[in-house]
Regions:
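Amphipathic alpha-helical interface elements
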Residues: 1-156
Length: 156
């Protein structure tokens, strides 16, 4: 991807994040068009004809080795934008910012370019779906058990 194209993509996300509440539907349309363009740019010479965005996301995700969580976030955006664009769901700023963060990190992975600071400051900081640390498993060392009687296999 060219630097100008990357900058333009980040600018689209920045504009979407700064959109007024009554224009969030338009912002979703712009973000969805951006995601489609990014996916198509990663498969220009493919003879594979993929008409739906879901297939293109999965293809590109496999090609650039996105984690399952990253793929799920892209598909979550796709489903949310479908609902908003088909007027089954009212667009919400929190979801729009979550989805802008998803696309920004996808673009960062595609281009190797850092997210501009002005955009990064607008994105949500804490999001349970972005936790990268593995879950901690604490081993139980001692346990107190109360029981009335026992047999060979169980405590009652």
């Amino acid at each position: 991807m060219e630097k100008e194209e990357i900058k333009e993509s980040f600018d689209i996300l920045l504009t979407a994040c700064c959109t007024q509440d009554d224009k969030l539907g338009i912002a979703y349309k712009q973000m969805r068009d951006l995601l489609e363009r990014l996916c198509r740019s990663q498969m220009p010479n493919e003879s594979l004809q993929m008409t739906d965005l879901s297939a293109r996301i999965s293809f590109v995700a496999a090609r650039i080795e996105l984690s399952i969580a990253e793929q799920n976030r892209l598909h979550t955006f796709r489903l949310t934008s479908n609902a908003v664009l088909n007027r089954r769901e009212v667009p919400q700023r929190e979801k729009l910012l979550r989805d802008a963060k998803t696309i920004a990190f996808f673009l960062k992975k595609l281009s190797g370019t850092d997210i501009p600071e002005t955009l990064y400051r607008l994105l949500p900081k804490a999001d349970a779906t972005y936790i990268v640390a593995p879950l901690a498993h604490k081993q139980v060392e001692r346990m107190r058990v109360c029981f009335q009687y026992s047999d060979e296999f169980f405590l009652y």
